[in-house]
């Protein structure tokens, strides 16, 4: 589960760099949406990983 959290972190950083950096002007809105989606998935994966190890 920690593996997926790291994958989501990397994807969120890439999407954020493209969306907020203005590199891809036409797809900036999509990149910003993807940033938030993968950021939420990162947090969910981290929480599941922590609860799974606590048992």
UniProtKB/Swiss-Prot annotation:
Keyword Cell membrane: yes
GO cellular component, one term: plasma membrane
Principal localisation: membrane
Keywords: Cell membrane, Membrane, Transmembrane, Transmembrane helix
Top-rank taxon: Bacteria
HAMAP family, per database record: UPF0391 (MF_01361)
Family: Belongs to the UPF0391 family.
NCBIfam families noted in UniProt: PRK13682.1-1, PRK13682.1-3, PRK13682.1-4
Protein name as catalogued: UPF0391 membrane protein Meso_3110
Organism of derivation: Chelativorans sp. (strain BNC1)
